[in-house]
Amino acid sequence: MFDGIGFMELLLIGILGLVVLGPERLPVAVRSITGWIRAMKRMANSVKDELEQELKIEELHADLKKAESQGLKNLSPELQESIDQLKSAAQSVNRPYKVEDISPASSSAPVDPAPTETKTAETSANSEKPNG
């Protein structure tokens, strides 16, 4: 992380920070700076991941166009693998959602949190009223 900065430079920055900010504000400043650095690293990594994903999609698209121009016959193994990946991705997108079968034996009564909260509120309101 500190490739171009040596130990003496870091020590000088620390001493200057201590003199300028003081001992009370220096730890807070260091924490906020490290938070900013972490946020920038996360943003850079997410941008890098998105670019890699877009490049992969673009490569698959180019392979598909190349395979289409060859008539889907006598394809190289790389092109055939790309087509197989595209087919599996298309099947996963077109696959309907799996609906889980809920049997009545598994649950004895329907769960409804709203009436329970209302009953709790009514009970607490009734306990606060004076009797008489």
UniProtKB/Swiss-Prot annotation:
Provide ranges: composition bias, Low complexity.
Answer: 103-115
Where in or outside the cell? Cell inner membrane
Q: Name one GO biological process term.
A: protein transport by the Tat complex
Main subcellular location of this protein, as a coarse class:
membrane
Locate the transmembrane regions by residue number: 2-22
InterPro entries recorded: TatA/B/E, TatB
Task: Please list where the region (Disordered) is annotated.
Answer: 86-132
List, alphabetically, the GO terms of the cellular component aspect.
TAT protein transport complex
Question: In which residue ranges is the amino acid composition biased (Polar residues)?
Answer: 117-132
What topology does the record note for this protein and the membrane?
Single-pass membrane protein
GO molecular function annotation: protein transmembrane transporter activity
Arranged from A to Z, the UniProt key words for this protein are:
Cell inner membrane, Cell membrane, Membrane, Protein transport, Translocation, Transmembrane, Transmembrane helix, Transport
KW Transmembrane (keyword) present: yes
Q: PANTHER family, from UniProt?
A: SEC-INDEPENDENT PROTEIN TRANSLOCASE PROTEIN TATA, CHLOROPLASTIC
Q: What is known about what this protein does?
A: Part of the twin-arginine translocation (Tat) system that transports large folded proteins containing a characteristic twin-arginine motif in their signal peptide across membranes. Together with TatC, TatB is part of a receptor directly interacting with Tat signal peptides. TatB may form an oligomeric binding site that transiently accommodates folded Tat precursor proteins before their translocation.
Please state which protein family the record places this protein in.
Belongs to the TatB family.
Quaternary structure and interacting proteins, as annotated: The Tat system comprises two distinct complexes: a TatABC complex, containing multiple copies of TatA, TatB and TatC subunits, and a separate TatA complex, containing only TatA subunits. Substrates initially bind to the TatABC complex, which probably triggers association of the separate TatA complex to form the active translocon.
In Swiss-Prot or TrEMBL terms, this protein is called: Sec-independent protein translocase protein TatB
Instruction: Please name the source species.
Output: Shewanella sediminis (strain HAW-EB3)
Please name the taxonomic classification of the source.
Answer: Bacteria, Pseudomonadati, Pseudomonadota, Gammaproteobacteria, Alteromonadales
Q: Which gene encodes it?
A: tatB
